[in-house]
Every structure is written in structure tokens, then in C-alpha cells.
């Protein structure tokens, strides 16, 4: 049920309005605040007294607005925490959960149900994605605009989405991070389970200044951020268009096994453009095996390109496209196939699309399509997309999309990599570490002392702070002078280790 609250009006859109949330007299699960910033603290107080534990603050004018706004934000958080109230925002669009029929935003349009989750710091970006999604028939499990992340942040949202059965893929728009440790921990955990596509603003100085003004957060080094999210297994895109197309691909059946690409085309020019963009992005074109070449030589006209890109001629029929696809899908050197079509005089774009759909489920490789043009190929593109096969207008777009999605699966493999047992860090002596561990095992020890732990780390080249053992206060003073002040003092005793062992 929805309750309207406004002290100045008796009704709002023909619904009765209450002067305060305390007048409702029924349990309220969530409140949405869209009033002047100065009124927010007292409204949070009222929510707390009424037992409301979840609040969305759409209102702007807090930490992003300077010192006065930041002080107001701190006051809001202090009151909220005293009542155990959680806050999404402030300065956010709100949240949409299509499956629940929940639209707690001021967006003009809502989202259809689907398996994509969108998490964004920018409400304007959410509105743009929603508009694009409606035109492209893309659905969402959740659309979450988190705004200034004064309380609930990226980390907690990601932790929730990991276990949300309706969410299969996650799209993120990021401007700044308040808690880097929590963000990276949640990001890494989520990316192990669900594909994450991330767009971050502020890559350059002007953009960083703009995001700092908008989000009220200090910019971080883009190089450091990029390396961190890549190691977490996340795919980072560079612009809004790539985010849209990645969303489109994730909602389809496209699952590349690797990044070795075969290109099938009915025109040399489009094939060359696709190959060039692949080269820009470091995507290797698959080297076709002798067996594949023999099959193609038998099935294609004599003037086919005899190389990858596989130009099958401007008069290519649906059957010729099908034969070319079937030939490369059994090639061990091919991970995925890009099928391109230019609407030439002898081409039937719709018939070719239908032929591809007929064999798509029989393939052991993923397909992505590029039907170039507009009027003559519009229906064919839609037919492909309805069948779960991504279809694009331009070869560069298709290649970029393939790059980002294949990079996700490649990043997942990196997450599983561990250093080999024989790998030795600079300055390390792994053999000495093995001797130490064997000695401890022989003593039936389960806990290392601090000095033993430091010694073990040192043998593997891991930097540790210098440590020394002192048996008396005088020795401790002497050791401290040797190490240099200030120093940390810890008790070193096997009895303490045994006690800890028993407790655990």
C-alpha cells in the first residue's frame, strides 16, 4: 500500500494525504523523502520513532553542496543510526524492482522485468538507460540509484545482488568510492558469480573534477582503479554506448569461449573494417586449420577469400552462410564467430537470418551478427535478437562488444590463477621456509608465534616489519633504540598461542 504525506494538502492525486508519517497508524516498510534538505533530519526522526527502517532520500543538497550540506548529511546519519534506519541516497533517483511492481523513483518510465541489475551513482544515467532499455526490449531485476552513498553503498548493494535469484548480470555506473576496501571485496565476490560490466566517469582531469562536484567524492587514480577492477574479474567499458551494447549482449545467449574470432562476411570492405578494429583491441583472428580450409574450399565458390575474414561473396545465399558457419564451428582454433551481412542486390537479409537461427542451437561456438545498414536489414536484425543472437549495425560496434564480453570470461580465468609452487619472490628463500614448516609440524604445533610467522614470510620474500625478542624491560629499551621509535610491543608466549588454539 502507498501512503502520501504532506502537511499542506489533504489529498494528493485523489489519495488521502497525512500530515506526518506518525499519523498513519500502520506498519510502513519504506519511506521516500523528496522535500527540502533542511526538513530531512526531522523526517528521519519521525521515521525512526514510527519504526520505519528503510528510507530513500531523493533530495539533493547534502555533502555535494559544500560544508553546510556535509554537516546536514552528518546530522541525518547520526539520527538514522540512533534508530537503526538505513538510507539509500541522498541525491538519488530511487529504486525499481519490476517483479514486485515497485517503482520508488521519479523516472518518467519504469522497467520491464528481466535479469539485468543496474546500479548507478547517477540518476540521470539511470533515466537514460531505462529509456534505451524500453526501446530495445531489455528488462531488469533491479534498477538502483545510490546517489551520494552516505549510508548504503556499492558494497552492500553488490552483496545483496549476489544472492538475488532474479539477477544474472550486473551493470554499474561509478563516479567515486567512499569505502575502497568494502567496494573491492564485494566486487570481487560478485564477479566470481555474476558478470559485471562497469562504466566509471572521471578518467581524465576534467571528468574527475566534474564527478567530484557531482558526487562530492575525491577522485582516485584511474590507472589504479582500472587495474583493481580488472583483477577483480570485472569488465570495464569506456562509454555509454558500450554499456548499452554490453547489456544487450548479456541479455542474449552470447557466451564466447575465448577471444579467437572467425569473421564471415559477404563483402571484403566490411570484413577488413572488422579485422582492423579487432587489431586495435588486440583480438586475434583465428588461424583456420587445414581441415576447415578443405571444407570451405569444397563448399564455397572458388573466389572466396581463402583466409579469415572469410569472404563468401556478394551473392552469398542462406545455404552458403550456413555452410561457412558449420565449417568454422568445428575448428579447434575458433572460439566465436562474427557473421556479417551487407544488403547487396542478390542478398536476402531475412532469409540469411532465419538460416542462422535454424543452426544456432546446434553450434558449439557463440555467434554474434552484424547486419549493416538500416531499412533493408531492420526486420532481420530484430528476428536475430528475438532469437537471442546479438545483432548490430556496424562492425566496429560488434567487435567492441565481443572484446568486452570475451574479456569478462578471460578475467574469470585470471581469478582462478595462483602462483606456481616453485615461484620465488625477489629475495626469498622458499627452501628455508619448508624447513621451518617441517620443524613446526614435527613438534605437532598448530599456531605460529609472531617471530616464526615473520620468519616464514621473510623466506618467501614478503616484506615484514623488523621484529626482535626482548626478555626484560631493559632489553626492550635496547631493542627499541636499535629498531627506531615508535615501536609496537606484543607479548610472545607459547602459552598464549595454546590458549588461542583452544578457543578456536
Enumerate the language-model features and the residues they cover:
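Catalytic-core regions of core metabolic enzymes
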Residues: 1-504
Amino acid at each position: 500500500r502507498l501512503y502520501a504525506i504532506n502537511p499542506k494538502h489533504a489529498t494528493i492525486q485523489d489519495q488521502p494525504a497525512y500530515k506526518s508519517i506518525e499519523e498513519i497508524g500502520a506498519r510502513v516498510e519504506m519511506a521516500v523523502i523528496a522535500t527540502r534538505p533542511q526538513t530531512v533530519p526531522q523526517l528521519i526522526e519521525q521515521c525512526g520513532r514510527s519504526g520505519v527502517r528503510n528510507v530513500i532520500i531523493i533530495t539533493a543538497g547534502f555533502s555535494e553542496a559544500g560544508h553546510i550540506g556535509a554537516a546536514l548529511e552528518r546530522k541525518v546519519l547520526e539520527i538514522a543510526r540512533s534508530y537503526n534506519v538505513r538510507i539509500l541516497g541522498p541525491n538519488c533517483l530511487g529504486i525499481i524492482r519490476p517483479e514486485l511492481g515497485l517503482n520508488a523513483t521519479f523516472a518518467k518510465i519504469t522497467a520491464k522485468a528481466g535479469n539485468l541489475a543496474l546500479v548507478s551513482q547517477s540518476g540521470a544515467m539511470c533515466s537514460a538507460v531505462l529509456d534505451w532499455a524500453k526501446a530495445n526490449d531489455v528488462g531488469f531485476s533491479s534498477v538502483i540509484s545510490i546517489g551520494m552513498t552516505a549510508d548504503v553503498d556499492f558494497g552492500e548493494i553488490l552483496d545483496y545482488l549476489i544472492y538475488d535469484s532474479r539477477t544474472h548480470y550486473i551493470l554499474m555506473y561509478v563516479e567515486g568510492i567512499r569505502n575502497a576496501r568494502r567496494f573491492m571485496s564485494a566486487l570481487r565476490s560478485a564477479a566470481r558469480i555474476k558478470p559485471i560490466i562497469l562504466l566509471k566517469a572521471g578518467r581524465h582531469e576534467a571528468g574527475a573534477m566534474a564527478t567530484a562536484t557531482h558526487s562530492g567524492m575525491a577522485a582516485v587514480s584511474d590507472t589504479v582503479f582500472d587495474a583493481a577492477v580488472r583483477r577483480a574479474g570485472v569488465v570495464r567499458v569506456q562509454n555509454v554506448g558500450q554499456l548499452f551494447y554490453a547489456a544487450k549482449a548479456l541479455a542474449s545467449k552470447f557466451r564466447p569461449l575465448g577471444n579467437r574470432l572467425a569473421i564471415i562476411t559477404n563483402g571484403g570492405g566490411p570484413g577488413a573494417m572488422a579485422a582492423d578494429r579487432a587489431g586495435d583491441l588486440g583480438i586475434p583472428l583465428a588461424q583456420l586449420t587445414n581441415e576447415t580450409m578443405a571444407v570451405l574450399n569444397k563448399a564455397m565458390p572458388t573466389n572466396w577469400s581463402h583466409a579469415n575474414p572469410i569472404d563468401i561473396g556478394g551473392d552469398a545465399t542462406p545455404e552458403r552462410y550456413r555452410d561457412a558457419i558449420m565449417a568454422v564451428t568445428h575448428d579447434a582454433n575458433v572460439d566465436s564467430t562474427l557473421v556479417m551481412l551487407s544488403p547487396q542486390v542478390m542478398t536476402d537479409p531475412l532469409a540469411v537470418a532465419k538460416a542462422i537461427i535454424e543452426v544456432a542451437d546446434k553450434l558449439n561456438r557463440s555467434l554474434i551478427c552484424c547486419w549493416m545498414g538500416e531499412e533493408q536489414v531492420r526486420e532481420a536484425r530484430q528476428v536475430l535478437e528475438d532469437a537471442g543472437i546479438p545483432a548490430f549495425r556496424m562492425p566496429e560496434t560488434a567487435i567492441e562488444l565481443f572484446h568486452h564480453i570475451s574479456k569478462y570470461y578471460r578475467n574469470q580465468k585470471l581469478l582462478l590463477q595462483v602462483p606456481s609452487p616453485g615461484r620465488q619472490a625477489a629475495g626469498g628463500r622458499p627452501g628455508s621456509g619448508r624447513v621451518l614448516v617441517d620443524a613446526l609440524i614435527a613438534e605437532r604445533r598448530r599456531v605460529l608465534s609472531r617471530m616464526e610467522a615473520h620468519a616464514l614470510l621473510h623466506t618467501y620474500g614478503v616484506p615484514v616489519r623488523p621484529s626482535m625478542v626482548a626478555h626484560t624491560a631493559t632489553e626492550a629499551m635496547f631493542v627499541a633504540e636499535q629498531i627506531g621509535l615508535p615501536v609496537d610491543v606484543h607479548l610472545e608466549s607459547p602459552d598464549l598461542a595454546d590458549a588461542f588454539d583452544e578457543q578456536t
